[in-house]
Curated annotation (Swiss-Prot):
Pfam families (alphabetical): CoA_binding_2 (PF13380), Ligase_CoA_2 (PF19045), Succ_CoA_lig (PF13607)
InterPro entries: AcCoA-synth-alpha (IPR014089), Acyl-CoA_Synth/Transferase (IPR051538), CoA-bd (IPR003781), Ligase_CoA_dom (IPR043938), NAD(P)-bd_dom_sf (IPR036291), Succ_CoA_lig_flav_dom (IPR032875), Succinyl-CoA_synth-like (IPR016102)
Reactions accelerated catalytically: acetate + ATP + CoA = acetyl-CoA + ADP + phosphate
Superkingdom per UniProt: Archaea
Stated pH dependence: Optimum pH is 9.0 (at 80 degrees Celsius).
Protein name as it appears in the record: Acetate--CoA ligase [ADP-forming] II subunit alpha
UniProt GO MF annotations: acetate-CoA ligase (ADP-forming) activity; ATP binding
Function: Catalyzes the reversible formation of acetate and ATP from acetyl-CoA by using ADP and phosphate. Can use other substrates such as phenylacetyl-CoA, indoleacetyl-CoA and isobutyryl-CoA, but not succinyl-CoA. Seems to be involved primarily in the degradation of aryl-CoA esters to the corresponding acids. Participates in the conversion of acetyl-CoA to acetate and in the degradation of branched-chain amino acids via branched-chain-acyl-CoA esters.
Keywords: ATP-binding, Ligase, Nucleotide-binding
Gene name linked to the record: acdAII
Sequence similarity: Belongs to the acetate CoA ligase alpha subunit family.
Subunit: Heterotetramer of two alpha and two beta subunits.
Thermoactivity: Optimum temperature is above 90 degrees Celsius (at pH 8.0).
Gene3D superfamilies xref list: NAD(P)-binding Rossmann-like Domain (3.40.50.720), Succinyl-CoA synthetase domains (3.40.50.261)
Amino acid sequence: MLDYFFNPRGIAVIGASNDPKKLGYEVFKNLKEYQGGKVYPVNVREEEVQGVKAYKSVKEIPGEVDLAIIVVPKKFVKQTLIECGEKGVKGVVIITAGFGETGEEGKREEKELVEIAHKYGMRIIGPNCVGIMNTHANLNATFITVAKKGNVAFISQSGALGAGIVYKTIKEDIGFSKFISVGNMADLDFADLMEYLADTQEDKAIALYIEGIKDGRRFIEVAKKVTKKKPVIALKAGKSESGSRAAASHTGSLAGSWKIYEAAFKQSGVLVANTIDEMLSMARAFTQPLPKGNRVAIMTNAGGPGVLTADEIDKRGLKLANLEEKTIEELRSFLPPMAAVKNPVDMIASARGEDYYRTAKLLLQDPNVDILIAICVVPTFAGMTPTEHAEGIIRAVKEVNNGKPVLALFMAGYVSEKAKELLEKNGIPTYERPEDVAAAAYALVQQAKNVGGGVNG
């Protein structure tokens, strides 16, 4: 089911080019890295494209073609699609623009493309899109740089914004499992793709950038089922009246009032993000298990960030855990007299890796704690190593191993880089701002409610 888009046995790039100024050049160059099957360039004029034997038509290709990427001028798209059908292609990504987004005539032409595709049993992503990626299969069927490998599937209705977010995540060392630019959604839409992604192994969460949904009822129906299996996070553009009008003119889809969308998301268990950063923060949280409740313990080596995080937690309707007396006494037994041993636990700036280990272990073992947020702000000094605090947290998590989620907030900018890398490698999502880690904790709690995790509070 739609797997031929993301793990195809053969790919044709129709409009593959030797001219670096053309999109077909970039798409083919990126796809040459794919190892899951053969990649064939199709170009009516060239014998070879980028050193690979080219074919005049997709029908001339000797091998099997599961997926075709169409990046030819608009006037050739229809005929190309018919040839794909005759060849037995299963999935088609149409990058070419100039269809439904241009008005009534374009919408009519787009409808015709879908009719042709369905006649041959093909499905379409696009038109007017950037393409698709599956980082777990080394598949980059776009004209942009491939995303880093991760476990969030990101579906974007805006190609340019989607590309911008991919570039942002590369810089911030955040990974995607899949990137799908849906364009005009003439055929496959959010609901179809969510349905497919619900059962994949490598996609732990699904993030959506939405401007407008064509079939609201089906979206709700599918989302209700999908959110019971894995989290869906939506960033909806066009909340204001002017934004809504802009969204409608951009993709040619119905934007609809934000109130309607908000109700639909709530009804179907979709988590709502208000910004790009919030969407990414929420989506990244799901390398962690889901919590049993909404009580959060905070440990920190500086007072300020602990208080700021407590404020953000409160804003989200989560609770600061009341630590057991036994936990408080044990913390007091090894932390300095100036340390604050009630939640948030402020171990003060002198805290070493061992203190992080012992504190994290006690907090995770406390039955009143559902989620742990471990904060490290103070840059290393007095002989501390750059990763000792992170190592302490990881050691505690591995030893206690009781299925409670742990999130990290490392705020010392470039000084924290190595520690953050180590935490992420061990599946602990690491953030730089209190509001981001709070968004992540909130997302975990909400998703636990979706799957019926019996969340208290």
